[in-house]
Amino acid sequence: MKSQPSLSGLTILMSGGSRGIGSAIAVRAARAGANIAFVAKTDVPDKRLPGTVHTAAAEIESAGGRALPIIGDIRDDETITRAVTQTVDRFGGIDIVVNNASAITLSGIGELSLKRYDLMQDINTRGTFALTSAALPHLLESRHPHVLTLSPPLNPDRRWLAEYAPYTVSKYGMTMLTLGVAEQYRERIAANCLWPRTLIATAAVQNIVAGAEGMRAARRPEIMADAAAIVLGLTAAQATGRCFIDEDVLTEAGISNLDRYLHDGATATNLVPDLFL
């Protein structure tokens, strides 16, 4: 794998991206020369969450990229159509789709409301299907087509079903759809998944998964961003149908010092593994 990938001139369409891992991936790709279009809901600041589409766009442009923030809900079909149309109109095509947007509720069957179940399915699984499907005609015309989904490897350990099957089903659905693209378009479109080895310091981890203590046992989103940039530099002939782990990607690329990615208070020995690993 190349340790310094060039995405120069390529156009990325991403779901989410106003904060966290998605924003970090967008900024990193912008530094590598990519155009970034992203669909997110946060138009005005929310005191509970950092970042808006506008602050994310400013960071992309500060990194040297061109940004197209699209305000909308990934669950809405019109938003998907509008996002694809505006991206193609602005940048001339779509080379890469990054399925980043995700909802999480860690509750089991009998504990989770149908409303929350539908939310996870609609954003995670359906959103991945909808955005990828809508962009597919443009990917097939690209010189470097790639679908990258932030979802885990399919772990047969039944622990994840026992603890929170609804979320597990939605994330594994994202993975299976991506592997489906890889098989259906094996020689034409690269389609891969990427997942962190450890907890990543995001608002979701702090507010839902692990609290402040978990943040002190996490890595920064930049580790996922650097790994994503490397994977996105690969062609279908080099890698497709893979479920990559961030630190494995970096190690294979010759990046051995991962301490640079430690979040405040974290050490190399107290990192907590992410879900599904």
Set out the residue ranges of the language-model regions.
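Conserved Rossmann-fold SDR core element
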Residues: 29, 93-95, 175-178, 184-196, ...
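A short, exposed helix-loop element centered on a Lys and neighboring polar residues
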Residues: 132-133, 179
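Active-site loop of short-chain dehydrogenase/reductase
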Residues: 10, 65-66, 93-94, 139-153, ...
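Canonical Rossmann dinucleotide-binding motif of NAD(H)/NADP(H)-dependent dehydrogenases/reductases
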Residues: 4-41
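Catalytic loop of short-chain dehydrogenase/reductase
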Residues: 140-186, 197-200
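C-terminal helical subdomain
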Residues: 193-194, 212-277
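Substrate-binding pocket helix/loop in short-chain dehydrogenase/reductase
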Residues: 108-109, 116-118
